[in-house]
A protein has these predicted regions:
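Sec/Tat signal peptide C-region and signal peptidase I cleavage site
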Residues: 18-23
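Mature, soluble, non-transmembrane domains
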Residues: 93, 97-197
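Acidic, glycine-anchored loop motifs typical of Ca2+
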Residues: 62-73
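Short, solvent-exposed beta-strand/turn "edge" segments of beta-rich domains on protein surfaces
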Residues: 24, 35-44, 112-117, 181-184
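N-terminal secretory signal peptides that target proteins for export/translocation
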Residues: 1-3
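Early extracytoplasmic/domain-onset interaction patches
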Residues: 25-51, 55-57
Length: 197
């Protein structure tokens, strides 16, 4: 194991691919999605994960090398390499559709991590293959881990935000029964971007 803490345990589990039947939530994430506009089109989605206190504490202990309560660039790069990159094999717990077609593979950029009040937040950007006008093509997103090793819940009361020219847009959250997972027990939340005009 690269490190003794939970951050490394999560990565090792992701790489090893423990069977879903053996999994249950060990890490808890409160997630939000920010749709980033370029002009009147969605160019990307920024995802934020706020971790539970137990996992946060381990990330801080493992990666805040100078114990100053802040992650510097080197520490963030260390977190990305050892406690984020392997999630690529699990779609970064992020699913995006444009006009009903899933975007595959998911690419991410601009990873960052920060800590506040003992809790760690990851942030990363998922660019769309090309900018999309949500008034012309339906844009939808879901954030979850289908193995249920990590429980991902949308932030309340602000699961969806807009940046740029997203005026008149809102994020409608519904349950997507067609994508039940973990033996059909868990029904993921689906975000649909709805824009007037």
């Amino acid at each position: 194991m690269i490190r003794a803490g939970a951050a490394a345990a999560l990565v090792v589990w992701l790489i090893a691919g423990i069977a879903p039947a053996m999994a249950h939530p060990h890490v808890f994430i409160t997630a939000s999605a920010t749709f980033v506009f370029a002009g009147d089109k969605i160019a990307a989605m920024r995802v934020e994960w706020l971790f539970d206190d137990v996992f946060s504490d381990t990330v801080i202990q493992d990666h805040d090398a100078n114990h100053d309560g802040h992650f510097d660039k080197k520490e963030i790069a260390d977190i990305e390499a050892h406690a984020f990159t392997a999630v690529k094999d699990f779609h970064y717990f992020t699913y995006l559709w444009v006009a009903g077609k899933m975007i595959e593979p998911i690419h991410v950029r601009d990873f960052s991590a920060r800590q506040a009040n003992g809790l760690v937040t990851y942030s990363f950007v998922v660019p769309l293959p090309e900018p999309v006008d949500p008034r012309q093509a339906k844009v939808q997103a879901e954030l979850y881990d289908e193995t249920y090793f990590v429980q991902v819940d949308l932030d309340k009361p602000h699961p969806v935000r807009f940046e740029g020219a997203g005026h008149g847009c809102q994020g409608k959250v519904t349950k997507d029964a067609k994508r039940r997972y973990y033996g059909g027990v868990i029904v993921p939340d689906q975000i649909t971007v709805v824009c007037g005009g």
